[in-house]
Amino acid sequence: FSNPNTVRWYQDKISELIRMGVSAIKCDFGEAAPYNGLYANGRTGFHEHNLYPLRYNKALWEAVRNSSPNQEGVIWARSAWAGSQRYPLHWGGDASTNNVGSTGMLGDLRGGLSFGLSGFSFWSHDMGGFVTESPDDLYRRWLPFGFLSSHTRAHGAPPTEPWLISESFTDAFRECAEMKYKLMPYVYAQAKLCTEQGLPMVRALFVEFPEDAGAWLCEDQY
């Protein structure tokens, strides 16, 4: 993405999809640009590694925006760097299907809180995790977390469609989905506020309660 000709070629391909009716494009990976690579601008990956996802986000976001009716559309990006705040939105990548350590549901929340403190208003995650089949109890617990995030997605390597799990799980999924639809006026209002004031939708507690010493130590609530 340091080559303008490549960017134009890529954007033309994306624009064809948008004109077909696609409204969102997944901006996957982007964080693995090799340090020893040589880029079109003559610089090595040592200098370009972090710029790669920024340029990737920008190229895709511009293609989606410029090809969409009323300049609407969204990217669903995994990698980012300083400046990617302009190109919403991002998600937490491939989470493990557990609730321990730094890679499962708790790790996703920690990442989302950190992301919000870095100036990103919108952030999402894969409900239930991605890597392996999610345990029923974990996926159920992940549902309200996912539906009460700004953008909601169920996605994973094994199928995550609720009707493939059980009837009772489908009922729980539907209940959370209906809850979010009822809350959409509030969600839209908060989204507008966040874009105007630079706030994250998922906020670390000390953003709202800076005088509370305990809020500065809390990493599993928002």
List each language-model region with its residue ranges.
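Catalytic-domain carbohydrate-binding cleft regions of carbohydrate-active enzymes
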Residues: 1-222
